[in-house]
């Protein structure tokens, strides 16, 4: 059995749906929210690589590196906010983010 473009797209759609489901299901825990966003970005990257490989163009694979760079910066900023929230309030609840003003 050979893997076709449809197999990769279905896997990307499943990962994307799990990520969106995680975002909507758990909006209070910041760690789960960040992991769900990263899962959505992983699904998008998988689709870029699948289309790039299928059509023989390397532009999609190069674009994935830019997305991974932005995702790493987003994760670093999100984790910095998480550490700040936990140090000040001893919680990682997203509802408490409005207390970090100042």
UniProtKB/Swiss-Prot annotation:
InterPro entries: NADH_UbQ_OxRdtase_chain4L/K (IPR001133), NUOK/Mnh_C1-like (IPR039428). One of its GO terms (biological process) is ATP synthesis coupled electron transport. It comes from the Bacteria. GO terms for molecular function: NADH:ubiquinone reductase (non-electrogenic) activity; quinone binding. It is found in: Cell inner membrane. It holds the Pfam family Oxidored_q2. The keyword Cell inner membrane applies. It is a multi-pass membrane protein. It is an enzyme of class 7 (translocase). Its main location: membrane. The keyword DNA repair does not apply. It catalyses: a quinone + NADH + 5 H(+)(in) = a quinol + NAD(+) + 4 H(+)(out). Coiled coil: none annotated. Its EC number is 7.1.1.-. Keywords: Cell inner membrane, Cell membrane, Membrane, NAD, Quinone, Translocase, Transmembrane, Transmembrane helix, Transport, Ubiquinone. The chain crosses the membrane at residues 5-25, 31-51, 62-82. One of its GO terms (cellular component) is NADH dehydrogenase complex. NDH-1 shuttles electrons from NADH, via FMN and iron-sulfur (Fe-S) centers, to quinones in the respiratory chain. The immediate electron acceptor for the enzyme in this species is believed to be ubiquinone. Couples the redox reaction to proton translocation (for every two electrons transferred, four hydrogen ions are translocated across the cytoplasmic membrane), and thus conserves the redox energy in a proton gradient. NDH-1 is composed of 14 different subunits. Subunits NuoA, H, J, K, L, M, N constitute the membrane sector of the complex. Belongs to the complex I subunit 4L family. This is NADH-quinone oxidoreductase subunit K. It comes from Bordetella petrii (strain ATCC BAA-461 / DSM 12804 / CCUG 43448).
């Amino acid at each position: 059995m050979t893997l076709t473009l449809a197999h990769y797209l279905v896997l990307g759609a499943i990962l994307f749906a799990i990520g969106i489901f995680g975002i909507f299901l758990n909006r209070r825990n910041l760690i789960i929210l960040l992991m769900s966003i990263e899962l959505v970005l992983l699904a998008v990257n998988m689709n870029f690589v699948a289309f790039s490989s299928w059509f023989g163009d390397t532009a999609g694979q190069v674009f994935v590196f830019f997305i991974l760079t932005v995702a790493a910066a987003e994760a670093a900023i999100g984790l910095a906010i998480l550490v700040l929230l936990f140090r000040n309030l001893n919680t990682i609840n997203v509802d408490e983010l409005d207390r970090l003003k100042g």
